[in-house]
Amino acid sequence: MSRDLDSRFSFREVAAVNEWLMTKSKAIHAMRDNPAHRIGLLGASWGTDLTKDNGRGRWKKTWEKMFQDPETFADRSSKGPDQEILQEYVWRTWGKRSSVQHDSFFCEKFTGSIGFPTQRLIEKNNYVAAVWNDGEILKKKCPKPCRRYPDWIHC
């Protein structure tokens, strides 16, 4: 699992991870749970299982390509290079095809994504990868196609 150190695991996240772990063939788990989560693989909310879909072999090749590219780690002054690296070397090459994707807002953009297995509670830090001491409360309604159940307006 990859998480930012300033976020905490939630019941919602645990339920989504458990659902992914029950799949037999998808090496990557991607979670997008906020309107700001607009890219395929966020640096703060993904996981991998090396035993699924040749995950170990795919990651080995990914790391080899990354280390051969002098640009991969050249610019450390910008925010978010981890996400750019994940998009280029993992998501676009093999991660998208070998993933379970939980998505609350962009399920139509990310084909094959599914809604979260739990309904969002209206409380502080109520989305995956929330910064724990911000106390943000996400109240935005999610689009109907992203809802696991039609009556879950805060999915």
What is each stretch, according to the model?
Residues 7-42:
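Conserved donor-nucleotide/metal-binding helix-loop-beta segment in metal-dependent transferases, i.e.
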Residues 34-155:
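Catalytic core and acceptor-binding pocket of nucleotide-sugar-dependent glycosyltransferases
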Residues 5-7, 90:
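Short, flexible loop/turn elements at secondary-structure junctions
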